[in-house]
């Protein structure tokens, strides 16, 4: 979009009367409504207002990985930039400051520092130097059908080097934190804050209410209302999980409250999944660089710091979360109600690359982190439960799992429910990739409460 004047934001407010009246919320809503040109005008006005640039043009990228953010390119009188911002509902009433990139660099993490930043909630945006590097999410996707591990050795080695560097920073910066310090960290916007009703803070609401309450789920061979679905236990390919969705949401709302994470904190990016990682250099010597530190902090609860990368680099793939149409073409899924059980059968499975990513994170990051927490007496007895509830929040709160509510179709919705059950519940009489992972990172059997 070529921009000649600052847009009148008020002209767009009829798109959704309940929408927050902020530029970032408006831009995301306009993109969702297919009004990309108007969204680009809003971003142009935001850049001009926050940084004083004369904006010649703005182009928003079409990006499957930006589920709660926008990015693209801006040409201004001060040069050309790559821009990105993350946006959450109710962010003006949330704790913590967006985009504290400098603390990551000071801690020794490889991070791309923005040239300019606005951190005001509702007007938060970063301007980076213009770059055309690919992100690790895009590079990794190239190998999701690859069965020969020698073909993705370079990508895996780069990921291992990043995991090693991040783990070193976690161990170096590990320190006691108070309940107040935990509550002030913006990482909770990715977990508990998405479950919170700001007008009734004691009640489960937020995205849970807008995504699922009283809604219908169209699954392959079955339609269920949330009232019924939420009270069923789920089995996946014959493995039954221990808790209903209703129970898991209630537990996440209670047990992931920010004050509950008083204990151990680290300096962390907080959302360093591979769509927030640049790939630099030739294939033989790849170097990974973090960017978009929307939730970075210096007192990030240690058990939450690596949850988002663990889920989004591994269990969100192949295809089902970011490319549901591809998942529908490549995978099969069926759903059947059997008494009080929703039985899902699917041929979805982690690809060799995703399993290798999980193994690397297991050995280089989670094992040493949990071992150090235990040696300091800072590992909660129920650490496994907390990790599973946080992992559960990733698929169910990043976007609605309902077919037709966004990008999902019945097949990807069924796979998403299967993954959510695996993240939150314990397998009864069996095992799965996550249960094996958690067993393997436990400092000792007594430290892992199922």
Predicted regions and their residues:
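ATP-dependent phospho-/nucleotidyl transfer catalytic cores
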Residues: 139-269, 280-283
């Amino acid at each position: 979009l070529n921009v000649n004047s600052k847009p009148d934001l008020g002209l767009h407010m009829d798109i959704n009367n309940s929408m927050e009246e902020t530029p970032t919320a408006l831009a995301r809503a306009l993109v969702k409504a297919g009004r990309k040109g108007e969204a680009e005008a809003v971003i142009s006005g935001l850049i001009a207002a926050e940084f004083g640039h004369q904006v010649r043009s703005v182009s928003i990228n079409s990006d499957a990985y930006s589920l709660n953010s926008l990015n693209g390119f801006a040409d201004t009188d001060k040069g050309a930039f790559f821009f990105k911002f993350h946006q959450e509902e109710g962010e003006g009433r949330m704790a913590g400051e967006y985009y504290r990139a400098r603390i990551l660099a000071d801690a020794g993490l490889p991070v791309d520092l923005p040239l300019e930043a606005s951190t005001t909630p509702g007007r938060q945006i970063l301007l980076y130097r213009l770059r055309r590097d690919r992100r690790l999410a895009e590079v990794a996707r190239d190998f999701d059908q690859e069965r020969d591990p020698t073909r993705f050795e370079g990508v895996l080695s780069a990921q291992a080097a990043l995991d090693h560097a991040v783990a070193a920073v976690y161990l170096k910066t590990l320190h006691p934190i108070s309940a107040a310090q935990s509550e002030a960290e913006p990482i909770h916007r990715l977990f508990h804050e998405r479950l919170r009703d700001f007008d009734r803070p004691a009640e489960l609401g937020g995205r849970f209410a807008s995504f699922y309450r009283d809604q219908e789920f169209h699954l392959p061979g079955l339609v269920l209302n949330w009232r019924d679905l939420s009270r069923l236990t789920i089995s996946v390919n014959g493995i039954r999980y221990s808790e209903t969705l209703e129970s898991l949401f209630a537990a996440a709302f209670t047990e992931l409250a920010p004050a509950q994470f008083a204990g151990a904190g680290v300096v962390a990016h907080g959302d360093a999944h591979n769509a927030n990682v640049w790939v630099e250099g030739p294939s033989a010597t790849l170097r990974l660089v973090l960017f978009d530190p929307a939730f970075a902090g210096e007192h990030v609860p240690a058990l939450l710091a690596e949850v988002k990368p663990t889920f989004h680099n591994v269990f969100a793939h192949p295809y089902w979360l970011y490319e549901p149409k591809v998942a529908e073409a490549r995978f099969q899924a069926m759903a059947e109600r059997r008494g009080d059980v929703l039985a899902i059968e699917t041929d979805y499975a982690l690809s060799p690359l995703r399993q290798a990513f999980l193994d690397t994170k297991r050995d280089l990051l989670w094992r040493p982190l949990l071992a150090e927490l235990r040696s300091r007496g800072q590992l909660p007895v129920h650490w496994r439960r907390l990790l599973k509830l946080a992992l559960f929040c990733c698929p169910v709160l990043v976007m609605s799992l309902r077919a037709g509510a966004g990008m999902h179709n019945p097949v990807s919705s069924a796979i998403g429910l299967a993954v959510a059950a695996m993240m939150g519940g314990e397998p009864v009489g069996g095992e799965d990739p996550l249960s094996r992972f958690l067993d393997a990172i436990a400092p000792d059997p007594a430290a892992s409460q199922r």
